[in-house]
Structures are given as structure tokens and as C-alpha cells.
């Protein structure tokens, strides 16, 4: 019995010892495995932290290795919210939702595009309508300005015509007629004065002014005023003084040359006539240079000045 009992005890002791041995050897093996793993990981980390060796190609350019982040890159499935084993059902749901969102975004963009096109068309139509309205307004303003200018021109012409009519009336009222003066002038001159007031003359712009065109003598050298006609204005009011003044002026004052006849146009003396030979005694002009009008009497010159207005400058004919 003892042997039999010892047998199981031995067997149990051996089993317990073996179990203890195994249990005791188990922690040791785990520690050894951990130390081996740490030893294996340490060189790898050291190798990662150590600067990579420089590699140069044939031309001497340094070719650096890839970055650590690129070497440790992970696939896209690692960053997805649904795991790979989490199912293809979740992926299909996500794909359907994204497709619906993309379709809705495309539809909204299309609607916005249509709205933008419609707004641009409205803006263009508004701009064209504004341009047309501005052009019409400018044309209307130009037309109004033209009508205003035309009205102003007509008004100025009417005022000018009225002023000329008033001036003519004033001259007719204040100009003493030859017949009313009774100063001894012939009836022909009174008729000439009436013609000057009522009819056309050689000087249309002087018809409203009491100026006789016969007072002016036209020559190639210029326009001169007749000396004997200077006293015509005083003949009507002071006839005796006018006659005396004309007699004195014709006797003492020197008359001018006409400048139109052939003797007046000559510039050189003949040196053959008596006037040229006796220049010291007579102080006369060359006979071939004497004016034909100066050869006539002063009274004849006065009569020619008193010609009617319409027949002015008749002595040149």
C-alpha cells in the first residue's frame, strides 16, 4: 500500500515538479523573447535615426534616399472610416450617398448657370435699351438746340429789319426836302432827293442815311471827297453863305486831279511845251499832263457834283 501510495505521490510530485518547472521556465522564456525583440528593434531604430549615406552618381550629384514618410506610407484603405472587414455593404452605401451628393451638386450648379445666363441676358438687354434711350435723348436735345438756334436767328433778323425800318422813318422825317427849303435849288435836284429816298441807288446801304454819293470821287489812287461838294450840306439852310463859300473855295483852293484821264496817267514831262521851257517864270505843269477835269470851270464841277443820286460819277462817262 505504501508503495502504491508512494507511487502516486511520486507521480504527483513529478507532475507538480514538472509543472512547476514548466511554469518556472515559462516566464524566463518570455523575458528572453522580449529582450530579443528589443535588441532587434533597437538596431532598426538606430538605423532609421542614423543619417543615410550620401550616394553620388557619375556626375557627382547627390542622390538622396526617399523620405521616411514616403517609405512608411500606408494604403488608402487604412485611412477609410469603414474597415476592410467592415464590409462591402458600408462601402456601397458610402458610394451611393456620394453619388447622390455629386448629382445634387451638379444639378445646383446647372441651375445656377441657367440663372446666371438669364441675368446676363437681362443685363445686356438693359444696357442696350439704356444705350438706345441715351441716343434718342441726345438726338432730341440736338433737335431742340437746332430749333432754338433757328428761332434765335429769325428773331435777330426780325429785330434787324425793324431797326432798319425805324431808321428809314426817322431819316425821312428829319431830312429837309429840297422843295420845302426853297433855297433856290432847281426842281431837278428836289426830284433827285425824292428818288434817293424812295428808289434804288448805286449805294443800297446808304439809302437810309442823308449822304449823297455824288460827294465821293473814285480814282485808282483811292476814294476822295469832292472839295466843292463839302459845302452842299449848308446850301439848304444857308444859301448865301454856301454860295460865298463855294466861290471862295473855287478861287483860292487848289483842285485835285481826277487820276483817270490820259494826262493824269502820264508820269514824265514832255520837256518841249512852253510850260516845260519856261518853268522858272510860270511854274506851270506840262501841258500834256494837265487834267481834263481841271481845264473846266469850277462852276461846272459844282453842277456835276449836284447830279441826281442814281447818276453819280457821270463825269467819268
Curated annotation (Swiss-Prot):
Record's compositionally biased regions (Low complexity): 1-49
Gene Ontology BP term (one): negative regulation of transcription by RNA polymerase II
A GO MF label: DNA-binding transcription factor binding
Subcellular localization: Nucleus; Cytoplasm
KW Nucleotide-binding (keyword) present: no
Binding positions (Zn(2+) 1): 258, 261, 264, 291
InterPro entries: CXXC4/CXXC5, Znf_CXXC
Motif (Nuclear localization signal): 252-257
Listed Gly residues bias regions: 83-94
Record keyword Cytoplasm present: yes
Record's GO cellular component terms: cytosol; nucleoplasm; nucleus
UniProt binding sites for Zn(2+) 2: 270, 273, 276, 286
Keywords: Cytoplasm, DNA-binding, Metal-binding, Nucleus, Zinc, Zinc-finger
Region described as Disordered: spans on this chain: 1-96
Zinc finger (CXXC-type): 251-292
Domain description: The CXXC zinc finger mediates binding to CpG-DNA.
Role summary: May indirectly participate in activation of the NF-kappa-B and MAPK pathways. Acts as a mediator of BMP4-mediated modulation of canonical Wnt signaling activity in neural stem cells. Required for DNA damage-induced ATM phosphorylation, p53 activation and cell cycle arrest. Involved in myelopoiesis. Binds to the oxygen responsive element of COX4I2 and represses its transcription under hypoxia conditions (4% oxygen), as well as normoxia conditions (20% oxygen). May repress COX4I2 transactivation induced by CHCHD2 and RBPJ.
Subunit description: Interacts with DVL1. Interacts with RBPJ.
Protein name (Swiss-Prot/TrEMBL): CXXC-type zinc finger protein 5
Name of the gene this protein is made from: CXXC5
Amino acid at each position: 500500500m505504501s508503495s502504491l501510495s508512494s507511487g502516486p505521490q511520486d507521480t504527483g510530485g513529478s507532475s507538480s515538479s514538472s509543472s512547476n518547472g514548466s511554469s518556472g521556465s515559462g516566464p524566463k522564456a518570455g523575458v528572453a523573447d522580449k529582450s530579443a525583440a528589443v535588441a532587434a528593434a533597437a538596431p532598426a531604430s538606430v538605423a532609421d535615426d542614423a543619417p543615410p549615406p550620401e550616394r553620388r552618381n557619375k556626375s557627382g550629384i547627390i542622390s538622396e534616399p526617399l523620405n521616411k514618410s514616403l517609405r512608411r506610407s500606408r494604403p488608402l484603405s487604412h485611412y477609410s472610416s469603414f474597415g476592410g472587414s467592415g464590409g462591402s455593404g458600408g462601402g456601397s452605401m458610402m458610394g451611393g450617398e456620394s453619388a447622390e451628393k455629386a448629382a445634387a451638386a451638379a444639378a445646383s450648379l446647372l441651375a445656377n448657370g441657367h440663372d446666371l445666363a438669364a441675368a446676363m441676358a437681362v443685363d445686356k438687354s438693359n444696357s442696350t435699351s439704356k444705350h438706345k434711350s441715351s441716343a434718342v435723348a441726345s438726338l432730341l436735345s440736338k433737335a431742340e438746340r437746332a430749333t432754338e438756334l433757328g428761332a434765335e436767328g429769325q428773331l435777330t433778323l426780325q429785330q434787324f429789319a425793324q431797326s432798319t425800318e425805324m431808321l428809314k422813318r426817322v431819316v425821312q422825317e428829319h431830312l429837309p426836302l429840297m422843295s420845302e427849303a426853297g433855297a433856290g435849288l432847281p426842281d431837278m435836284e428836289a426830284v433827285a432827293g425824292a428818288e434817293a429816298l424812295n428808289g434804288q441807288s448805286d449805294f443800297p446801304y446808304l439809302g437810309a442815311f442823308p449822304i449823297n454819293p455824288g460827294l465821293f470821287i473814285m480814282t485808282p489812287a483811292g476814294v476822295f471827297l469832292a472839295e466843292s461838294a463839302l459845302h452842299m450840306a449848308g446850301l439848304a439852310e444857308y444859301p448865301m453863305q454856301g454860295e460865298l463859300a463855294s466861290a471862295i473855295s473855287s478861287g483860292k483852293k487848289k483842285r485835285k486831279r481826277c487820276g483817270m484821264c490820259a494826262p493824269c496817267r502820264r508820269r514824265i514831262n514832255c520837256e518841249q511845251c512852253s510850260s516845260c521851257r519856261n518853268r522858272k517864270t510860270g511854274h506851270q505843269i506840262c501841258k500834256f499832263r494837265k487834267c481834263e477835269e481841271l481845264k473846266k470851270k469850277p462852276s461846272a464841277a459844282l453842277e456835276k457834283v449836284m447830279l441826281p443820286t442814281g447818276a453819280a460819277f457821270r463825269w467819268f462817262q
